[in-house]
Amino acid sequence: MDFDYSDIVVTVKLDEKTFKRFARFDMFSRRKKWIRPALFSLILIVFAFIALLARKEQSGVIAAVLLVVGIGLPLVYVGTFLSQVNMQAARANLKPDQPVYTVPLRDEGVRIVNDRKEEEPQEVSWDSIHRAYRKNGCIYLYVTPSKAFLLPSKQADAPDHEVWDFIRKRLGEGKCKG
């Protein structure tokens, strides 16, 4: 039985796993930041094989250096990113039972209330919301291209599919993925 909700309230309690999953999604799936390191790696590997085909005196050394740099730098890039995400998650002190923010979804827009510190609530109309994604049991609500709020499953006062339907109905199919 489906209900037509006029307001849905999501009291968000984030854990480290959800935060890290979002960071990986944002970096690699949404912003596609894996393409340049992969392209760099591919180019250097091709040059390494070309150097080996030259059969000159130092071509083996040049090929080895190109392979080490071509594989090593992208690995360092990804490793540094994952390390920074781990440090951010630890610094944020995310505990599954602590509310981080509350997001009432209303017909006129979204209101974000910070539950960790005293600050003015943020009001965002549906027209100005950039995009919404539904991935891995969580809705990523991007209020701008660089700022998202996470709405994990089973934390709203409505079933998860109703929350997603509510958002899709107000944003439109073009702004919703998942």
What is each stretch, according to the model?
Residues 1-42:
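N-terminal membrane-targeting/pre-transmembrane regions
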Residues 137-178:
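A membrane-cytosol interface segment of integral membrane proteins
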